């Protein structure tokens, strides 16, 4: 098992970042996400928005990794649940893979909150738990996947900035 975590501060207010995060895919920074389907969306009695989405991703796995995993399939699916609580000014998003679960599990949690000292900024904390199951070189693959998650997190931050920038230019 490998645990990866990170914190990133956006130079934008929470509501701006959340609107962009909800429209994060597709984006040119991370073209491996090839589809997003909203399966459920509802608002509860406390005004929290609950969403369940299915993300379709195309991972260009290196030949060595495909050989170790014994899988030629590179199209994978991810289940993403999110809760946006406007009263608490918090968005929590949890995702897990639903493809290749017999080989690997990746559970990711993202939390967006206003910066505690500057309301014009937003803090994103991320954590991923990666477990490769029953494969030799499992710890190597877990480290490789953690590196990929780190790279994709940076692409995600850039995508949110890109969406905000393009939303603001469309308004002005």
Curated annotation (Swiss-Prot):
InterPro entries linked: PRELI/MSF1_dom (IPR006797), Slowmo/Ups (IPR037365)
Keyword terms of this UniProt record: Lipid transport, Mitochondrion, Transport
Superkingdom in the source lineage: Eukaryota
Cross-referenced Pfam families: PRELI
Subcellular location: Mitochondrion
Chief place of localization: mitochondrion
Domain spans labelled PRELI/MSF1: 1-172
Cellular compartments per GO CC: mitochondrial intermembrane space; mitochondrion
A single GO molecular function term of this UniProt record: phosphatidic acid transfer activity
Site (Important for interaction with TRIAP1): 36, 49
Presence of the UniProt keyword NAD in the record: no
Subunit structure: Interacts with TRIAP1.
Described purpose of this protein according to its UniProt entry: In vitro, the TRIAP1:PRELID3A complex mediates the transfer of phosphatidic acid (PA) between liposomes and probably functions as a PA transporter across the mitochondrion intermembrane space. Phosphatidic acid import is required for cardiolipin (CL) synthesis in the mitochondrial inner membrane.
Family statement drawn from the similarity comment of this UniProt entry: Belongs to the slowmo family.
The name this protein goes by in its record: PRELI domain containing protein 3A
Source organism: Mus musculus
Lineage, top ranks: Eukaryota, Metazoa, Chordata, Craniata, Vertebrata
């Amino acid at each position: 098992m490998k645990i990866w975590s990170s914190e990133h501060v956006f130079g934008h207010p929470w509501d701006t970042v959340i609107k962009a995060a909800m429209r994060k895919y597709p984006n040119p920074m991370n073209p491996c996400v090839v589809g997003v389907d909203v399966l459920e969306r509802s608002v509860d009695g406390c005004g929290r928005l609950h969403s369940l989405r299915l993300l379709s991703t195309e991972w260009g796995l290196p030949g060595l990794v495909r050989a170790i995993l014994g899988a030629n399939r590179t199209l994978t699916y991810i289940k993403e649940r999110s809760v946006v609580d406007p009263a608490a000014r918090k968005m929590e998003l949890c995702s897990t893979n639903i493809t290749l679960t017999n080989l690997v599990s990746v559970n990711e949690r993202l939390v967006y909150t206003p910066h505690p000292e500057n309301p014009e900024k937003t803090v994103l904390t991320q954590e991923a738990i990666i477990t490769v199951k029953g494969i030799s070189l499992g710890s190597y693959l877990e480290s490789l996947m953690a590196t990929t998650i780190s790279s994709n997190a940076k692409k995600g931050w850039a995508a949110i900035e890109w969406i905000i920038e393009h939303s603001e230019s469309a308004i002005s």
